[in-house]
A protein has these predicted regions:
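A hydrophobic membrane-anchoring feature enriched in long, contiguous, low-charge segments
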Residues: 4, 15-18, 75
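Conserved short hydrophobic patches within well-ordered secondary structure
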Residues: 5, 22, 185-187
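Bacterial N-terminal signal peptides that target proteins for export
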Residues: 1-12
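C-terminal segment of classical bacterial N-terminal signal peptides
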Residues: 17-25
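GH16 jelly-roll
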Residues: 27-242
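Repetitive helical segments and hydrophobic/amphipathic motifs
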Residues: 14-15, 115
């Protein structure tokens, strides 16, 4: 084989092996099983969003001060107003990404028209990945219901609203989803409430929780009336890798 061809073959082979190694490493670096009772804030494990807004339907600015751990051993997200018609909100997310497994949270959402309290996984273009997301969302206008949803490479419209039979804002309950290659199952207090099997997300994402007020989405959330402060409470979070 001529020398130049040998060099080119080695370069191509090396590039392929490098790409394979990066892919394998990225997969290996997804987080393992954990349980966080929020007896304190682990800044090596979690990150607080701070100083920016998602824009569009989000009518608030994320502030680190709106994410706190209380003396009751819970994480609390706040929606506040520092000045007239300006709003600050809270978002907490994991440092690492997580893949297939069981995601659980014990929480109480905030109750008020025009707001969302959530627990979800997310990854997207800002992370250099497709937009994949799995949601548990409470629309504050009616906290006797929960909304499940997911996105695969940016394609959504998988909303499912489930009647809980209780007001989620009044007491802690456990909500979960089990994400597997061919399905997602959502649970409330250990009981399966919804199953999806079509176009399931594949990309590991960060575990996230947020509380925010909307704008321009009154048909979905209802109109936010400016009431504040409002709080969403999170007793614990658990992930079991499968």
């Amino acid at each position: 084989m001529p020398y130049l061809k040998r060099v080119l073959l080695l370069l191509v082979t090396g590039l392929f092996m490098s790409l394979f190694a990066v892919t394998a490493t990225a997969s290996a670096q997804t987080g393992g099983s954990f349980f966080d009772p929020f007896n304190g804030y682990n800044s090596g494990f979690w990150q607080k969003a701070d100083g920016y807004s998602n824009g569009n339907m989000f009518n608030c600015t994320w502030r680190a001060n709106n994410v706190s751990v209380t003396s009751l051993g819970e994480m609390r997200l706040a929606l506040t107003s520092p000045s007239y018609n300006k709003f600050d909100c809270g978002e907490n997310r994991s440092v690492q990404t997580y893949g297939y497994g069981l995601y659980e949270v014990r929480m109480k959402p905030a109750k008020n028209t025009g707001i969302v309290s959530s627990f979800f996984t997310y990854t997207g273009p800002t992370d250099g990945t497709p937009w994949d997301e799995i949601d548990i969302e409470f629309l504050g206008k009616d906290t006797t219901k929960v909304q499940f949803n997911y996105y695969t490479n940016g394609a959504g419209n998988h909303e499912k609203i489930v009647d809980l039979g209780f007001d989620a804002a009044n007491a802690y309950h456990t909500y979960a989803f089990d994400w597997q290659p061919n399905s997602i199952k959502w649970y409330v207090d250990g009981q399966v409430k919804h199953t999806a099997t079509n176009q399931i997300p594949t990309t590991p994402g960060k575990i996230m929780m947020n509380l925010w007020n909307g704008t321009g989405v009154d048909e979905w959330l209802g109109s936010y009336n400016g009431v504040n402060p409002l709080y969403a409470h999170y007793d614990w979070v658990r992930y079991t890798k499968k």
